[in-house]
């Protein structure tokens, strides 16, 4: 995920945005930085239920035990939210993911209070799915 910032830089960049329009544009930009998801990865087993838009998340564990995430969505803002979640879970093992609470990061970014209820529910669905897959691997 060399194209994406680390957690601390994400937070700094987000807080530098002057208003929510800039923050949404930054989220969309993060989504554009995600690598292209292969067509064969857009399968029902990688589809996230509970999202208003189509969302696919692929989780693989590398030889060092670190989880590598790939994902995509048919909506630009949702794809950006996928990127934010991936940044928060970057370089973690399955057990790290299970133990890590992303909510304090969302609070620092004031993210969830500026999302529509359906986007917030979709974000929670993504996090639940990632944590469930990680729990199965740990």
UniProtKB/Swiss-Prot annotation:
Pathway: Cofactor biosynthesis; iron-sulfur cluster biosynthesis. One of its GO terms (cellular component) is cytoplasm. Keywords: Cytoplasm. It comes from the Bacteria. It is found in: Cytoplasm. The active site is at 51 (cysteine persulfide intermediate). InterPro entries: Cysteine_desulfuration_SufE, Fe-S_metab-assoc_dom. The keyword Iron-sulfur does not apply. Its main location: cytoplasm. One of its GO terms (biological process) is sulfur compound metabolic process. HAMAP family: SufE. PANTHER family: CYSTEINE DESULFURATION PROTEIN SUFE, SULFUR ACCEPTOR PROTEIN CSDE. Participates in cysteine desulfuration mediated by SufS. Cysteine desulfuration mobilizes sulfur from L-cysteine to yield L-alanine and constitutes an essential step in sulfur metabolism for biosynthesis of a variety of sulfur-containing biomolecules. Functions as a sulfur acceptor for SufS, by mediating the direct transfer of the sulfur atom from the S-sulfanylcysteine of SufS, an intermediate product of cysteine desulfuration process. Homodimer. Interacts with SufS. Belongs to the SufE family. This is Cysteine desulfuration protein SufE. It comes from Shigella boydii serotype 18 (strain CDC 3083-94 / BS512).
